[in-house]
Amino acid sequence: MVSQFDTQHLLNSNTALVAGVDEAGRGPLAGPVVVAAVVFDPSQPRINGLNDSKQLSPACRERLYAHIVERALAYKVVMIDSTQIDTLNIYQATMLGMRLAVEGVAHVAKSARIDGNRLPKNLPCPAEALVGGDARDPTIMAASILAKVTRDRHMVELHLQYPHYGFDKHKGYGTPAHLAALAEHGPCLEHRQSFAPVRRMLTPKAIHARQSAHQHNDNSPTKAAFNMLIERDD
């Protein structure tokens, strides 16, 4: 367990308003990494069936998603797209998403508990990192479900735009079917060009298309946020 601030009060309190934070989609070859933060009222009963999203069926995740949104005092879901992932790297993109998600619930949360062993910089509240938190902490479990469901829905939408790749089935992960589609059609704008299986199949046309899309998105709020992150890390 890693602490950015003095979190002894957090560990000893049963009534603290704690934001659980988790991500989905660090490993895929395409699509965004999605981070969610959730705050529950600790005086209310736990939602039945909460678990690490990877241990739940899609139907169960969808059912729990509705309950989580209904019961949460606050929640925030952040998507960091493939262009930003390629600019920052997947680790820094995930850290950015976590910081933005916590900022989105900081008006309610007094502290944050984040799945993993690292914490983002410049969080707006005290925080702790909890290894295996998505299997240990109900609030992190809820965040993992919001992140996973949001990302899966987004990949189904991307399938309508790019039907050749089967995003609706593998959600961007490097399955044999996805790799075969990459070999046949080459990467699209949603592929992560910094990931080796995609990078090996890049063409000048694909690189130019990504650069054009990157320039088009230069003024987005999230782009400004990750520029600030890069400056702080220099």
Swiss-Prot record:
List the residue ranges forming a coiled coil, or say none: none
Give the CC-aspect GO terms: cytoplasm; ribonuclease H2 complex
| A GO BP entry | mismatch repair
Q: Where in the cell is it found?
A: Cytoplasm
| Annotated organism of origin | Xylella fastidiosa (strain M12)
* Gene that produces this protein: rnhB
The record's section on NCBIfam families has: PRK00015.1-3
Q: Where does a divalent metal cation bind?
A: 22-23, 115
Function summary: Endonuclease that specifically degrades the RNA of RNA-DNA hybrids.
- Chief localization: cytoplasm
Q: What class of enzyme is it?
A: hydrolase
**EC number(s) in its UniProt entry?**
3.1.26.4
What is the protein's given name?
Answer: Ribonuclease HII
Catalysed reaction(s) here are: Endonucleolytic cleavage to 5'-phosphomonoester
Q: Which InterPro entries match?
A: RNase_HII, RNase_HII/HIII, RNase_HII/HIII_dom, RNaseH-like_sf, RNaseH_sf
